[in-house]
Amino acid sequence: MAAKQVLFGDDARAKVVQGVNILANAVKVTLGPKGRNVVLERSFGAPTVTKDGVSVAKEIELKDKFENIGAQLVKEVASKTADNAGDGTTTATVLAQAIVREGFKFVAAGFNPADLKRGIDKAVAAIVDELKALSKPTTTSKEIAQVGAISANSDADIGDIIAKAIDKVGKEGVITVEDGKSLNNELDVVEGLQFDRGYLSPYFINNPDKQVAELDNPFILLFDKKISNIRELLPVLEQVAKAGSPLLVVAEDVDGEALATLVVNTIRGILKVVAVKAPGFGDRRKAILEDIAILTGGQVIAEEVGLSLEKATLADLGQAKRVEVQKENTTLIDGAGSVEAIKARVSSIDALIAAATSDYDREKLQERKAKLAGGVAVIKVGAATEVELKEKKARVEDALHATRAAVEEGIVPGGGVALLRARAAIKDLKGDNHEQDAGIKIVLRAVEEPLRQIVANAGDEASVVVARVLEGSGNFGYNAANGQYGDLVEQGVLDPAKVTRSALQNAASVAALILTTDALVAEQADDKPATAGLPHGGPGGFGGPEF
């Protein structure tokens, strides 16, 4: 086992604070509409330019192991806030640094860190309650666009495209971000339920111009096994042909004589039919087939539920207004399923999302839910260069998370003002002793810090602006984008309440842990010298060979 170094007391705390400050100082320059860029070196390829706090934090690893402990703890604040709310990482880092800085003044003066922590927790709980009271629900596309724009570092175009996407697919819909092919941002909306499986034979194509198979008002057969024998399928085909409707067959696979017969029927015009593979694998495939069944008002033909292909009737088949089958995608538009059944299915998926432990499972469940609830919107981010594209894409993703958070818990005035107004809730708050009162004072001072940093990044005097904002009330604040004071909600400077709340809670949680730290343990630095080479790079003092 490698030897360890141990630091105690003030020496340990000084090292942690040093690490906290190095990371926080690099992150906080990005805060606000006039925040600066940070350039991140890459071991290969072009450097990355970013204004995203968590991207900067993730890159920082300090040489001094004790300082690195402090940096990693604050990195945790940024990551946790990004996971919870998707944005607010820089605000969380600034708050954590402020609480640590103010807290260590009291620790150095001999205050009990455990009581300081209790005071901090008390103050944060009161501010969180006040933030909930201050927040108002987002009701208009304009508000959603404003939240998105602020989160994307005051880029109104990004705010607008996100608001349009939410308009199209609803608050429950899935919005994905992809690399675009042009210089401008584009929005692509897929209506209905789409899955990533296409036609099994190009002979099913009935629209050669678009290279798609289109079916109007088709029946939809859902089968969870492979179909190779046409005899199994004949009874259903005859019933569908009598009804005079087209047919979409979704099965684990269709091959052999079954596929050949379907192709021949299509070519001869006897029956308009398209066969596609069922999406997904294993249990996920069964779940998606069940989703399609509920959306189209049909049933999955499966032995498990006592249904067989030979005995299937038209009542077991689903229906949709329109189906489009491309080479790699199938889209079902306007399924005939009942609204109540779809709502019940969405609720059951919600319960699975809440219980999901892995991000992958959660993402796939949210995708299923969105396909049932509204549809899918794809934002294609355009830029002139690869470096700009990466930076812009990160901002779009941040803005998307922020708008979702705004829809979830409402909005509060931005620009650091919400925390200042919520501070009123703890002005008269008292702890159980004077040390807890000191913990409350730490938070009172720390909540000014986001506004101070926004102002400093805009090149103005922080103390003057904070004093002026505190003289006002309600939504009155400082708009760093234009240097004006006024009603921030009217000016569209908004923050999601969830982002502000998560930033404060995560910052206080980690900062309070740092304050109560009294010893640090880290691996001993390796003092071995580098392997000695020949002097002057080659034998006899000559340079080494050139290649």
UniProtKB/Swiss-Prot annotation:
EC number: 5.6.1.7
GO biological process: protein refolding
Signal peptide: none
PROSITE patterns given in the database record: CHAPERONINS_CPN60
InterPro entries with a match to the protein in the record: Chaperonin_Cpn60_CS, Cpn60/GroEL, Cpn60/GroEL/TCP-1, GroEL-like_apical_dom_sf, GROEL-like_equatorial_sf, TCP-1-like_intermed_sf
HAMAP family: CH60 (MF_00600)
Function noted in UniProt: Together with its co-chaperonin GroES, plays an essential role in assisting protein folding. The GroEL-GroES system forms a nano-cage that allows encapsulation of the non-native substrate proteins and provides a physical environment optimized to promote and accelerate protein folding.
Protein name, entry field: Chaperonin GroEL 2
Name of the gene encoding the protein in the UniProt record: groEL2
